[in-house]
Amino acid sequence: MDLPAPIHDILLVSLGSGLIVGGLGVVLLTNPIYSAFSLGLVLVCISLFYIPSNSYFVAAAQLLIYVGAINVLILFAVMFMNGSEYYNYFHFWTVGDGFTSLVCTSIFFSLIATIPNTSWYGIIWTTRSNQIIEQDLTSNVQQIGIHLSTDFYLPFELISIILLVSLVGAIAMARRE
């Protein structure tokens, strides 16, 4: 999407703030339904990040798969859970919670200190991407596959990490019962 620079910056800042607010909502809200809705906000913001980079198909696929299917499945699972038993196990600030919050805040502040000082323009993400893209790709599916494995590799890896963490959290909640 060819947007003027100020509008593009405002869009990215608003999507980034939506990601931060949604992520904090997932972690800090005690009601699991509100946490699932916050996860939906995070997934919507991630899918909307693809629109300024002219990847409309990827954005639509993210919305359909992650928000439309996975988040609805998480909401159904949370709603079928017995809420009263869940809150009996909930204690404020155990030793593990304190240690986890200390580790997470240290990682957060180290990333804040590292990211602005890193020169991202000299990094070569893949070595063969230019050779592959120079070939005559006739099919849109081939072009999407090449872009997903080269240009958009990092966002899909981040989504897989988010899904892995949510799966581990669901298993940990299920093992308590």
Swiss-Prot record:
It comes from the Eukaryota. NDH shuttles electrons from NAD(P)H:plastoquinone, via FMN and iron-sulfur (Fe-S) centers, to quinones in the photosynthetic chain and possibly in a chloroplast respiratory chain. The immediate electron acceptor for the enzyme in this species is believed to be plastoquinone. Couples the redox reaction to proton translocation, and thus conserves the redox energy in a proton gradient. Belongs to the complex I subunit 6 family. NDH is composed of at least 16 different subunits, 5 of which are encoded in the nucleus. The lineage of its organism: Eukaryota, Viridiplantae, Streptophyta, Embryophyta, Tracheophyta. It catalyses: a plastoquinone + NADH + (n+1) H(+)(in) = a plastoquinol + NAD(+) + n H(+)(out); a plastoquinone + NADPH + (n+1) H(+)(in) = a plastoquinol + NADP(+) + n H(+)(out). It comes from Nymphaea alba (White water-lily). InterPro entries: NAD(P)H-Q_Oxidoreduct_6 (IPR050290), NADH_UbQ/plastoQ_OxRdtase_su6 (IPR001457), Nuo/plastoQ_OxRdtase_6_NuoJ (IPR042106). This is NAD(P)H-quinone oxidoreductase subunit 6, chloroplastic. Keywords: Chloroplast, Membrane, NAD, NADP, Plastid, Plastoquinone, Quinone, Thylakoid, Translocase, Transmembrane, Transmembrane helix, Transport. It is a multi-pass membrane protein. Pfam families: Oxidored_q3. It is found in: Plastid, Chloroplast thylakoid membrane. One of its GO terms (molecular function) is NADH dehydrogenase (ubiquinone) activity. The keyword Transport applies. Its EC number is 7.1.1.-. GO terms for cellular component: chloroplast thylakoid membrane. The chain crosses the membrane at residues 10-30, 32-52, 61-81, 92-112, 152-172. Gene3D superfamilies: NADH-ubiquinone/plastoquinone oxidoreductase chain 6, subunit NuoJ.
